[in-house]
């Protein structure tokens, strides 16, 4: 199934996880990518974390222009899509959070178990100056 490419052209934080049925499947997939004649796909894999005891590949970047027509972004999308095409047990979840707080999610495969890996938390923080304390003379 072709992943819907999300158009978030301004600065975004992006994270995804690809889950395989087994660690062996994940490792075989990594080797397939390394032997492809596609430098963008190899670079996308190099930007991912793969050194897990679990059968997953993860990616996170922040404050990036995530244009869907950029070759680097297309490569990351292809990495997720190809894993699901090759392995019926595979699935992925991707979350993109724009600088305006807009959140977009996409997933493929049986990804209920991937919700714990990527989630957003909205919070309000302040850095007000310290309140001047009155000193009372007794």
Kindly give the residue locations of the regions a language model identified.
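Short, extreme N-terminal segment that most often corresponds to the first beta-strand
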Residues: 2-34
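Charged interaction segments
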Residues: 32-138
């Amino acid at each position: 199934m072709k992943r819907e490419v999300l158009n978030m052209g301004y600065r975004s934080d992006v994270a995804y996880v690809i889950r395989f049925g087994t660690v062996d499947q994940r490792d075989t997939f990594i080797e397939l990518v390394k032997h492809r004649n596609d430098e963008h796909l190899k670079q996308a894999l190099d930007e991912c974390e793969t050194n897990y005891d679990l059968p997953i590949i993860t990616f996170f970047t922040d404050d990036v222009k995530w244009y869907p027509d950029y070759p680097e972004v297309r490569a990351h999308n292809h990495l997720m899509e190809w894993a699901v095409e090759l392995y019926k047990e595979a699935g992925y979840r991707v979350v993109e959070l724009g600088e305006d707080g807009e959140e977009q999610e996409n997933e493929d495969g049986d990804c209920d178990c991937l919700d714990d890996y990527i989630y957003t938390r909205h919070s309000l923080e302040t850095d007000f100056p310290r309140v001047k304390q009155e000193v009372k003379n007794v």
